[in-house]
Amino acid sequence: MQTLSIQNLIIGFGKAGKTLAADLAQHGQDVILVEASDQMYGGTCINIGCIPSKKLLVEGQRRAACADSGDAVFSAAMQAKNGLIPKLRAANFAKLDNMEKVRVINARARFIDAQTVSITGAVGNAGEQGERQIRAERIFINTGSVPAVPPIPGVDGARVYDSTGILSLAERPKRMVIVGGGYIGLEFAFMYRAFGTEVTILDNLDEFLPREDRDIAGEMRRILEARGVKIQLGVKVERFDNTATETTVVTSGGSFAADAVLLATGRRANTQGLDLEKAGVRVDARGFIEVDDHLHATPRIWAMGDVAGSPQFTYISLDDYRIVRDELLGEGRRSRRDRAIFPTAVFTNPPLGHIGMTETAARKAGRNVKVSTLKAEAIPKAKVLGQTDGLLKAVVDAGSGEILGVTLLCAEAHEIINLFKMAIDNRVPAGYVRSQIFTHPTMAEALNDLFAPF
């Protein structure tokens, strides 16, 4: 069996892996990047996550406003999504494939030992088949995560989908049941409701969006229900009864018939078949690779992105790359400890942006806080956009004026929330935001009113 020797081996063509490969190559280092599927160049976000789902959201909202039929809107949105994703995937591949120091190999990888990986499949850009071994000085694992499928009877039915399959339906379902009331489920609820699908969300929790303050969660639920989405809390799914024409979700709280069922039940580490134990790589109780603050799984093996148990966002995977890059090519000062606070966005309609502490968390931590809220309907730009649903909230230390947290459920929240990453990192006081000059009419100028009480 032929053995290839390389300085850097990257397993997985995700955000961190592809960016690190290009950077190392630009610094004169040889890189082999192994990816199991040629449909995953660029990682989850580009192919089966953020980009296709957001494209469907945008197309659905835009076309629905034109009063087209639900089926026509759905078909046009799918065509737009299907036209975009292959272009992005090809661009990601070409960027690395055109680099002299990078070799991309389509194959499945498994560890032989801490420095050796066996690859099976198409082991070269020309597509030759076979099994080879790669011996590397350094190995980086960036294999991401995959949908977690609960062991429920009937879950293998043809009309039961995970978050990947639901992005590629040939026809619009008239009725959809979403199992799971978390953020992924909410995004798809808004998406398919915009297409005209009847949507029901089932969640085994008794509390809707338990991580959010009750006023924010209540407003989100109000918006969903006002648009016709049904929400059932505190129900346990017992089985899926599948027939040729529909799937019935049987729960502790009744039965729900659907043309499509979405499992929005979380994600698990994509490590199956890697034989991590042969390399001395340990995983935690949830199956994610255990790493230190510099993303080392072992002295010569790093893990980056979802597979390392990092928060499951593409921009966090990019930050993982920065940590590793700083160790290899910089001063080695960056670590996971540097990102205790970062913004998040849920692409509902309106979007939900958040950073820092909620009011509930701040009070539980013993902080003396002042809180301000502002209804989106009070914002002139929201009226211009015709998007007056939502609620804005700021949590501030009552003594120092330090901004502890901000939650924005309103139009453009996914953009505006990023301002508060810089504000909190630089300890900008609430009074500065209150008196800041913003353009008009914009959603951002509402921050003057939101922070006026401080």
Stretches with model-predicted labels:
Residues 9-39, 43-44, 51, 55-56, ...:
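Flexible, glycine-rich terminal cap/loop adjacent to redox cofactors
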Residues 2-6, 16, 23-29, 33-172, ...:
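Glycine-rich flavin
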Residues 16-20, 160, 185-188, 271:
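Short glycine/serine/threonine-rich phosphate/pyrophosphate-binding segments
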Residues 147, 287-300, 381-393, 397:
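FAD-binding beta-loop-beta segment adjacent to the flavin cofactor pocket
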Residues 21, 25, 189, 193-194:
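Gly/Ala-rich phosphate-binding loop of Rossmann-like dinucleotide-binding domains
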Residues 12-15, 179-182, 306:
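Glycine-rich Rossmann-fold phosphate-binding loop(s) that bind the pyrophosphate
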Residues 156-171, 255-331:
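FAD-site-proximal beta/loop scaffold in flavoenzymes
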Residues 9-11, 109, 133-144, 179, ...:
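Short hydrophobic core segments
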